[in-house]
Amino acid sequence: MSSEKVRASHILIKHQGSRRKSSWKDPDGSLISATTRDDAVSQLQSLRQELLSDPASFSDLASRHSHCSSAKRGGDLGPFGRGQMQKPFEEATFALKVGEISDIVDTDSGVHIIKRTG
C-alpha cells in the first residue's frame, strides 16, 4: 500500500438517499429527508460555479453550506491516504492537482465538491 497522502477540503450536501440523514446543521434530519439527490446536485452545481470564479471562497462556502462537521474547519479534512475515505471520494481527490476543484462526487454520505489542498 502506498504511503502517499493528500489533503482536501469538501462541501457535502446530504439527501434522501444518504446513509445518515442527519448532520450537525440538521440534527433531526428534516431538511435532509426533504432533499432529493437532484436538489442536492443542483445546490452543489451553483456553489461550484461560484468557486470556479472565486476559488478562495471555498472555506467560507463550506462553512455555510456543508453538512459535514468539517464545515467548522472550512471543509478541511486534513491529510489522508488511500483506503481511508469512501472509494469514489478517494479516487476523485487523488486525481485532482493541488488547488483544483472536483466535479460532483457521489458517495453513500451524499454529494460532494472536493478541493485538493495538499
Swiss-Prot record:
Cellular compartments annotated: Cytoplasm; Nucleus
Region called Disordered, residue ranges: 1-37, 61-84
InterPro entries: PPIase_dom_sf, PPIase_Pin1, PPIase_PpiC, PPIase_PpiC_CS
GO CC annotation: cytosol; nucleus
Other noteworthy facts: Like all plant Pin1-type PPIases, do not contain the N-terminal WW domain found in other eukaryotic parvulins, but contains a four-amino acid insertion next to the phospho-specific recognition site of the active site. These extra amino acids may be important for mediating the substrate interaction of plant enzymes. Three amino acid residues (P79S, E91D and A95G) differ when compared with the partial sequence of purified protein. The existence of two or more genes coding for this protein is not exluded.
Gene3D superfamilies named in the record: 3.10.50.40
Enzyme class, spelled out: isomerase
Function text: Prolyl cis/trans isomerase with specificity for phospho-Ser-Pro bonds.
Family as reported in the entry's similarity comment: Belongs to the PpiC/parvulin rotamase family.
Domain PpiC, chain residue ranges per copy: 3-118
Reactions mediated catalytically: [protein]-peptidylproline (omega=180) = [protein]-peptidylproline (omega=0)
Protein name: Peptidyl-prolyl cis-trans isomerase Pin1
GO molecular function: peptidyl-prolyl cis-trans isomerase activity
Ways its activity is controlled: Inhibited in vitro by juglone.
Entry annotated with the keyword Nucleus: yes
Record's comment on post-translational modification: The N-terminus is blocked.
Tissue: Expressed in roots, stems, leaves, flowers and seedlings.
EC number of the protein: 5.2.1.8
Primary residence: cytoplasm
UniProt keyword list: Cytoplasm, Isomerase, Nucleus, Rotamase
Bias (Basic residues): 12-22
